[in-house]
Amino acid sequence: MSKVTYRLLGRTGLKVSNIALGVATFGSQWGPRWTMSAAEADALLGVALDHGINFFDTANVYNRGESETWLGRALRNRSARHQVVIATKCGYRTDPRDVNSGGCSRRNVVASVERSLRRLGTDHIDLLYLHLWDGVTPVEESLAAAADLVSAGKIRYVGLSNVPGWYAGQAEAVARWRGWPVPAAVQLNYSALERTIEHEFFPFTAATGVGLVAWGPLANGLLTGRYRVDLEERRITGDGRVTQTFTTGDVDPFRPVVPRVIACLADLAARRGRTPGQLALAWILSKPEITSVAVGVSCGDQLLENLAALDVSLPPEDLARIDEASAQPTPYPYTFLADDIQALVHGPEQLRAARPMTP
């Protein structure tokens, strides 16, 4: 049986499972392939609990609020609220009639938490993520609101999601300077098709101790092995959500790296007797910077397949092949700060010692 393990969330004493269950599909509001019945949601949560998952990821906008409602109800049905860590989020606009119902202002953060508590049917949220950088609210305002909510006992920990590296650094420094709760974790898109965060956030979390939770580890299903991508015809073939409702802008399925990674995972999976999706997850879990991986599934069988990735120990040569297949262009300024430039600063004989935190 796949063995879930537990890790501390950042520099806190909170223990979370290395696989988190994303419950965006809990609800009936988002249409085909993005919803399930209440009975299916209840059964899926039972599978997760039975296999040791204690970390559940939702948001106030998932399925227009039903995700939180159904998660809270499913936990109550099993009297399991006390044994789990609930992470939810605020930031996206929830009311088209209210211009202040989106963003990370004090007004919206506090109001969003109050509504989430009612939907979840609980007296506290374990981890509140600011769902995204809203582009306007000063970081001090958002963090002060979160600190007050921690003091009031309505949330336990604060996190960030989908923010630039400079914002995360500012938030961590401001919180520490003001004596406010320091962000416990950042939740970011990370997969073999989206490795941008390695340049900014891997060094950031190593330096600060902030936890790192990966979302989108299978790139909206592209890495499950169920799909093929034709770059010339710009066509995706396969039977599943990707071919029917692929609307996310987070992953461009027609980049050259996509079929290259799909082929690499398929080849390694055939050799190892595993599925491509399991290898894609195992590759992420091999990264010491990653605290937990949030997976979204539509049924218990899919969750069990994902959990089987915990039994996979990829040898160095397989990790290297996936690294090579998924290699993506290095952004500036890291292209400028490469070894040839660093050698001009430190001298070639001192280069290794001078760059202990190179991403």
Predicted regions and their residues:
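Short, well-ordered coil/turn segments that N-cap beta-strands
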Residues: L14-I19, G52-F55, A80-V84, T122-D126, ...
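Generic structural signal for well-ordered alpha-helices
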Residues: L45, E68, G72, V113-L117, ...
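Glycine/proline-rich, positively charged
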Residues: D95-E200, G211
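Aromatic-lined glycan-binding groove of carbohydrate-active enzymes
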Residues: I197-D239, T275
